[in-house]
Amino acid sequence: MQPRVLLAVTLLALLVSARAEEIQESSLLGVMKDYMQQASKTANEMLTKVQESQVAENAREWMTESLDSMKGYWTSLIGRLSGFLDSTPSS
């Protein structure tokens, strides 16, 4: 084989090998990019669920406090009305 042909074949083999490594690196980079996007999406979804859960918990607490307050007001009103009705003279 002539040295020029041997040199050309060697350079061609190196070029093909370098291109194959570049494709593998870009493929690996794509996989990592997809993984990071999926992880970010999952983290955002979980954060949203936690925030919604906290809002729901706050709403339940507010409703419980409001109902307890209304119950206390109603009990107080009934007590005053029954005291007022008991003290009124009957005819």
Swiss-Prot record:
Chain residue ranges for the region called Lipid-binding: 68-91
Gene Ontology MF terms: high-density lipoprotein particle receptor binding; lipase inhibitor activity; phospholipid binding
UniProt keyword annotations, A-Z: Chylomicron, Lipid degradation, Lipid metabolism, Lipid transport, Oxidation, Secreted, Signal, Transport, VLDL
Native source organism of the sequence: Cavia porcellus
SUPFAM superfamilies registered for this protein in UniProt: Apolipoprotein (SSF47162)
Signal peptide segment: 1-20
Matching PANTHER family: APOLIPOPROTEIN C-III
One GO process term, biological-process aspect: lipid transport
Protein name according to UniProt: Apolipoprotein C-III
Site location (May interact with the LDL receptor): K41
Cystine crosslinks: none
A cellular component term, taken from the record's GO annotations: intermediate-density lipoprotein particle
